[in-house]
Amino acid sequence: MTLKEEFPVLGMGCAMCAARVEQALRAQKGVAQATVNFAAQTVLVQYDNQACTTSQLQRCVQAAGYDLVISDNAAQAEEEAEQARSKQWADTRNRTLLAAALSLAVWSIQMFLTPSLPSALLMWLLTTPVVAWCGRSFYANAITQLRHGSAGMDLLVATGTGVAYLYSATVLCLHLGFGHGTALPHLYFESAAMIITFVLAGRLLEARAKSHTTDALRTLISLSPHTVTATDDEGRTWEKRIQDVSVGDLLLAKAGERIAVDGSVTSGTSCVDESMLSGESIPVDKEVGSRVYAGTTNLQGSFTYRAQCVGNHTLLAQIIQMVREAQGSKAPVQRLADRVAAVFVPTIMSLSVLTLIAWGLLGGADGWQRGLTAAVSVLVVACPCALGLATPTAITVAIGRAASEGILVQDAAALEEACRTGAVVMDKTGTLTTGHPTVTRAQWNGDKALLGPVLMAMESRSTHPLAQAVRQYLTDNRLTLSPQSAVLTPDTCSTLPGMGIEATIHGTAYLLGNRRLMEQRGIRLDEPLAEACRQWESEGHTIILLADGQEALAILGVADPLKATSKEAVDQLREMGIEVHMLTGDNDRAAAHTAHEAGIGNYAGNALPADKAAFVKHLQSQGKHVAMVGDGINDSAALATANLSIAMGQGSDTAMNVAMLTIIGSDMRQIGRAIRLSRTTVRIIRENLFWAFFYNIIGVPVAAGLLYPLCGMMLNPMYASMAMAMSSICVVANSLRIRGRGSRQA
């Protein structure tokens, strides 16, 4: 069986490390695809569990010089990886502090003491632990990379500092043996020490910054409680581990507690904060029969609920898995960075050697000395990490931000595609409207306190959606009981197919149905009711009439009302320069009314599923990137045809499976927010890539000595390493801006 799982990876230090892990896994038998998210330090693997096991995947990664965290529980694997990273971070911090103290001493000797043999020996003594202990990971990783035929950032740092240290130690030893009476040679101990210090400090800051890119995912994971209060029909309660909860268990939700699993309320009422799912801050009322979801918060009162979805089947678990997979995917814009990163280190190594040779041959008397300085600077100024982090950090932050606002992104490509949207096509029913027939108009030709219970009696046994709408209206308006507080029961009741219901209640015959039934039975409709019929029908309402044997007694108008956020959402899209179209299978009159209410000028009714897909293609033929928003099976063809497919989370599974973006709640404004988030993310990715390329394009020539003929300036390797460390930190920091801007700003 083919599985898709995400695993934490330990030991990756740069983009080349990520590429090496990908290559190792893709070469493993049974692995169809492997995608590393360097920013999140994870790998998404699609593999056949009959052809290879997770242990084989782990051994494969370990053979490449890294480690894969394997666990039966995703949360446990993440916790183990986090513990390992925390331990590694603490070790790096300790080595950085020691390196900083020793390097500062070496730098002070170099700057303030007169060059002498004792000062040179002291610098050698202080630099040795910096190189041998503080910087040991660079050399160990470099050796591993060479052994496996790869090259990464550690190889550049190890080569640069190793050359500086070994050269200085060698010439100092030669001076001790053969240089008595001669001038002390130029030494690079402070360069070797400071390079390691700055790179370690940069890694430390970068790791802390990168940890914030997955804050949203960690927040989602933390929403699930570890224990839950179980109960039984006799009211006894006991604590239960979340892993031990089974479908059908009766659970108790106390005020202020998080709900443990998805279920249905069996007793009690409350209101629940579902903002973590839908992004909507207004609490949702819950009563018997209401659905509740894992991770949401019970705000007041207590209620019991029956577990329906547990473990990885809860909505929260599915959201977490979707966010993991999306964060692990690669955006198309990342391909250029990947191609450059693949040849980056060999190219820099070659340029460093050429720099040394060019200075040695053309630089005059001290050409080789300057050449060594320039060669080391070239090695340490170059930064493939900035290129490797440019896209995944922004994608990871953006997808996490989207999830926290109730927007699920299928993959990075969807996020990139959304920014190009020029036209949005919306379905009407369930997308712009609530999808639930509701009585929105009522006019009575008699005492409604007497007629309401009659209506309730006639509709009480019907399962028709219109009957449900009428019952809900009567219940909400307290019109279900007679003045004697009794529930009326029909003496006789029969269905008239296509027209309505005929019933006798307390000896009086009643009709309930459409205008055709009234006309067929010769029921008189006085002018106020007739005018109301005409007016409401022009607004797209379905008309229901109640009559006795002679005249109409009441008229109800049933409609699918517009969602409260639909008009604002349409206005926002238009302000963003996006065309808005509406298509519906309803008649033209209903389509026109809804479009007018929503402020949509382009609409069409009587549209079949094939018509919707054809309309999307028509817009695409005009060169427009089209987003389709739908919620039902009849929208799936158009969703699949569109450049960007958006499903409303309360719709069908078919629509959500096809969609690239899913809006969990019913807030239509999330569509504009998703597009704004995409625009912000793509802009920041471009900024990151520009600065990463610009930094290397400018930094490498300057390090090689390009400015020396113009102004006599050579880039000190110490400052080159500082610039390299800052380049990665700046890329991560720029990506983290999405957390503060995201979907709220264009």
Say what each PLM segment does.
Residues S103, L466, D476-H593, L608:
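Signature of the cytosolic headpiece of P-type E1-E2 ATPases
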Residues F112-S116, R147, L166, R401, ...:
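Membrane-embedded alpha-helical bundles of multi-pass transporters
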Residues L97-A105, R335-G363, A375-C383, G388-T393, ...:
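Bilayer-spanning, highly hydrophobic alpha-helical transmembrane segments
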Residues K29-A51, S55, H186-F189, R218-H313, ...:
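Conserved cytosolic catalytic loops of P-type ATPases
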Residues M1-S119, K210, T219, R236-E239, ...:
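Flexible metal-binding regulatory segments at protein termini and peripheral loops
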Residues T2-L3, A19, I505-G507, A547-E687:
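Conserved ATP-binding TGD loop and adjacent catalytic N/P-domain core of P-type ATPases
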Residues L277, L336, T373, C383-M458, ...:
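Conserved catalytic phosphorylation-site environment of P-type ATPases
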Residues Q62-E80, A120-M123, T127-T227, T231, ...:
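Actuator/coupling domain of P-type ATPases
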